[in-house]
UniProtKB/Swiss-Prot annotation:
Keywords: 4Fe-4S, Cytoplasm, Iron, Iron-sulfur, Metal-binding, Pyridine nucleotide biosynthesis, Transferase. The gene is nadA. GO terms for cellular component: cytosol. NCBIfam families: nadA, PRK09375.1-2, PRK09375.1-4. This is Quinolinate synthase. It comes from the Bacteria. Its main location: cytoplasm. GO terms for molecular function: 4 iron, 4 sulfur cluster binding; metal ion binding; quinolinate synthetase A activity.
């Protein structure tokens, strides 16, 4: 069982800053005083990204969490990411500015239901996308991210069947790219499933020269319309190296902040959700704010706590992922 508790180690709370500038200054002071590191996912609000020490996707941030010398890790993302940081660095204090920052995909795969599903396939290698709870990770043989899933699955023994969870769209894409047959858990991301195909086709008609880039959590019919499919970090890299100057981006629009910062002379367009709604923004990612970031550093809460037995079991497949990735990178040099 995973416990997410609010642990208070500070006796007093400083006066609440009144402006964004004051919040940023107070956060910088607390970060230095506490020897804290602020990790932010690409889907965070721009003002959170701008104050972070490191910005990245799930794989990059898990590596940072494993290697940091900081005493306190503040994870500006969602709770499965903060859990991963705690799994990798149990001796450190891991803070999440808002405990309500969950994940529809992780919620789509309850640990007890996953255990029953896994028991029906006892001979399968269990590969779980990092977007799942610590309790599901603890039941897995290997963890992957969207940036390394195809490479890792391709390395698995050919004579062993594979169970993949929890994202069905990513699973189908990995199956297609790797050529491996997967038994796939039927989970989905509420954001990546809402992109409007009609809106995408209209944008393509209006900007025929634009490259369409998509995250593999999108629906298959949208991926088929893309010029490039990859994780958030891979999408960012593609826009930097591709000579094109216009890009239609099928993922959470928080990534556009980094794209525009790095390539101010290029144009980036996000795709609206079905019926033109603004649901292409992840409501959970956007729960973290400057005030909540300041408050969690001021009070040292909410903090993430994981039952040690669960943590140790969850660490094994995460470490296996990191080791396989290191071996793969070493073989390429």
């Amino acid at each position: 069982m995973v416990r997410m508790t609010a642990v208070c180690t500070a006796k007093t709370v400083s006066p609440v800053p009144s402006t964004r500038k004051e919040f940023k200054g107070a956060i910088a002071e607390l970060r230095k005083k506490l020897n804290a590191v602020i990790l932010a996912h690409y889907y965070q609000d721009p003002e959170i990204q701008d104050i972070a020490d490191f910005i990245g996707d799930s794989l990059e941030l898990s590596r940072r969490a494993a290697s940091t010398n900081a005493d306190v890790i503040v994870f500006c993302g969602v709770h499965f990411m903060a859990e991963t940081a705690k799994i990798l660095s149990p001796e450190k204090i891991v803070l999440l500015p808002d405990l309500e920052a969950g994940c529809s995909l992780a919620d789509d795969c309850p640990a007890d239901e996953f255990a029953a599903f896994r028991d029906k396939h006892p001979d399968h290698i269990v590969v779980s996308y990092i977007n799942c709870t610590a309790a599901v990770k603890a039941q897995s043989d290997l963890i992957c991210t969207s940036s390394n899933a195809v490479a890792l699955v391709s390395q698995l023994p050919k004579d062993r069947p594979i169970l993949f969870a929890p994202d069905q769209n990513l699973g189908r894409w990995v199956q297609k790219q790797s050529g491996r047959e997967l038994t796939i858990w039927p989970g989905r991301c509420m954001v990546h499933e809402t992109f409007s195909e009609e809106a995408l086709l209209k944008l393509k008609m209006m900007h025929p020269e634009a490259k369409v880039i998509a995250h593999p959590e999108c629906l298959e019919r949208l991926l088929e319309l893309a010029d490039y499919v990859g994780s958030t970090s891979k999408l960012l890299e593609y826009t930097e190296t591709n000579p094109g100057t216009k890009f239609i981006v099928l993922t959470e629009p928080g990534i556009l902040h980094q794209m525009k910062q790095r390539m101010p002379n290029k144009e980036f367009m996000d795709v609206p959700g079905i019926d033109g709604c603004s649901c292409n923004e992840c409501p959970y990612m956007r729960l973290n704010t400057l005030e909540k970031l300041w408050r969690c550093l001021s009070t040292m809460k909410p903090s993430i706590e994981i039952e040690e037995g669960v943590r140790q079991k969850a660490l094994i497949p995460i470490q296996r992922m990191l080791n396989m990735k290191e071996k793969q990178e070493a073989s390429q040099h």
